[in-house]
Amino acid sequence: MQAALKLQSDDARPLQILIVDDHPVVAEGWGRIIRTKTACEIASAPSASEGWRAWRQARPDLMVVDLSIGRNKIAGIRLIERLRRVDPDLPILVFTMHRSPVLARRALMFGANGIINKDSPPAEICAAFTEVARGGNYVDSRLAMQIALLNVSRPGTSAPRLTGREEEILGMITEGMSYRDIADRACISYKTVSNVSLVLKDKLGAANLADLVVKGIRYFEGD
């Protein structure tokens, strides 16, 4: 209880925490773990948009945000980016089932204070929560090493060559847009988007759409 209590007011009101996750069971489970660490009141939101509205209404002391919400693989990152524009000091802890250092690094770049896997043991979850609650940062050592290795140049490797159209569509895919939304924005057919996506997966060596998002981010970051 020691560190998290620093966020409480002088009248010792419970810590206000907002968990944004589309799986109620996960939010409830994390809530139980956090309650073992400090006196707190926990609210939850099942989507990024509802998380934004809940933040505006409640102005919590700390937020726990799922990296991927629903089918949008980077919805959590977009929410963090939006929050940081208006509240640069809000402690934000990201939890995720993805073990991608690329997505983890992106979450940290956009303002997350910490990131942890959903299946981490309770003791590690409490450690991450405590550190972020006191205003610090938390990334487990293995993931931190993987993030650091992203900056190591790899001799003999070069980025795949993409056409202008392929880059345009890849950019929208990495933003978490659906094929239908991409088709509408680019004024092309859904089938064209689907076909280009297949080409992109082949060129970037992506196994599926989630992997394409990760490799797309790396492509634009120049890794």
Swiss-Prot record:
Keywords: Cytoplasm, DNA-binding, Methanol utilization, Phosphoprotein, Transcription, Transcription regulation, Two-component regulatory system. GO terms for molecular function: DNA binding. Residues 155-220 form the HTH luxR-type domain. Residues 16-133 form the Response regulatory domain. Phosphorylated by MoxY. Pfam families: GerE, Response_reg. Transmembrane segments: none annotated. Its main location: cytoplasm. Residues 179-198 bind DNA. GO terms for biological process: methanol metabolic process; phosphorelay signal transduction system; regulation of DNA-templated transcription. Member of the two-component regulatory system MoxY/MoxX probably involved in the regulation of the methanol dehydrogenase expression. This is Methanol utilization control regulatory protein MoxX.
